[in-house]
Amino acid sequence: MRRSSSVQRVALLSVHTSPLAQPGTGDAGGMNVYVVELATQLARRGVEVEVFTRRTSSEQPPVVETADGVRVRHVAAGPYEGLAKDDLPGQLCAFTAGMLHAEARHAERHYDLVHSHYWLSGQVGWLTADRWDVPLVHSMHTMAKVKNAALAEGDAPEPAGRVIGEQQVVEAADRLVANTDAERRELIDLYGADPAKVVVVPPGVDLATFAPAPGRAASRARLGVPADAEVLLFVGRIQPLKAPDLLVRATAELLREQPWRRSRLRVVVLGGPSGSGTAHPDSLADLVRSLDLEDVVRMAPPVARAELADHYRAADVVAVPSHNESFGLVALEAQACATPVVAAAVGGLRTAVLDDGAGAGTGEGTGLLVPDHTPRSWAAALRTLLDDPARRTAMGARAARRAQGFGWGATAEATLEVYRRAVQDRAAERGADPR
């Protein structure tokens, strides 16, 4: 029996990182937030959502039902602990087998489509969608060719196997979801994606959690931050790509130029180690010591979302110095809390942040975009905003207003339309096929 173009059941794939994991630790980051929020919003719209992710602990139950009606299925594929992300390609066959086994208990074409996230999931999605004869929708989140073109110091290039794997997924997918027009262009120019298959759907922000507050006093009091402190905030995994070291070096440069600022300046780094190692946090702590900034820079582990919102609201400026971002959810969350952002002028950050320009600014921006990754340029940008509280306040107000257009509900609605068109096209391809 043929199914209509309506979308009733969706299989979301997040192989390498669980949507239930704490963002900012291990391999958990913005993609985790994306998958959780998308799944939740789809469920609220009557879509049955099942998320497949690799089991990483013997304590994880096979299936978890979230309060919002999303089913998260932990698939056994390789050892539970100690398996590096780079070794996961060797477990994709096992993961695929686990997915097929789970689906075998259902009627034919139980899922209307597969939506895979990141290239590892895309490899599994390619096979399972083909086996189930349903469309494959894929979100890259990051791309090897883009990352390799802008490698951070100390970061290893992505291997050829990933580049090939991404190319295969791009060619196999029925639809490719890009976060921004820039990402759409990269998919077309670097991977030869069919322009008709690439659809731009901006990510969202939880506007109920990340929202402005009247002043910063309450948030600072809850966090124990002095009312007169000047606070710079970094949120993200401690890895070369995210460049927290650049913020530390820029802080040292800033204090060399304005030593009087030291007693009030506080730089907060919220994030954990990337993957299963701790080398990067240790090296960042060593850098802080070598620059004699232990009284200025405070490193802390990731926090729950409500507390994270307090950190955004308590900050004067949020710094996002990444070497590349497909969008930059941290920048959007900060702006939703009415905090201006200083970000690198790369990737999706050029969409997430409206540059207020140099000098007195244009009066339209929500932050500053820095054109390079030198400590001097970053110190200058940070100093510009720290020296001008009125400009920060105006920027923050504009940022909060702009963030209202990025709710996750809008992301889900646009994604659902992508799903409907993919399902409709597949139904048309089947024609009179009675299966």
From Swiss-Prot:
The record's listing under Pfam families reads: Glyco_trans_4_4, Glycos_transf_1
Q: What is its EC number?
A: 2.4.1.250
Q: Which residues bind Mg(2+)?
A: Y312, R313, A315, T339
**Can you tell me which residues bind UDP-N-acetyl-alpha-D-glucosamine?**
Q22, P23, G30, R237, K242, V303, E325, E333
Q: What is an annotated GO biological process for this record, any one?
A: mycothiol biosynthetic process
Source taxon at top rank? Bacteria
Residues annotated for 1D-myo-inositol 3-phosphate binding in this entry: H16, D27, A28, G29, G30, M31, N32, K85, Y118, T142, R162
Which Gene3D superfamilies does this one have? Glycogen Phosphorylase B
Protein name, as recorded: D-inositol 3-phosphate glycosyltransferase
- Tell me what organism the protein belongs to: Kineococcus radiotolerans (strain ATCC BAA-149 / DSM 14245 / SRS30216)
Provide the taxonomic classification: Bacteria, Bacillati, Actinomycetota, Actinomycetes, Kineosporiales
Q: Which gene encodes it?
A: mshA
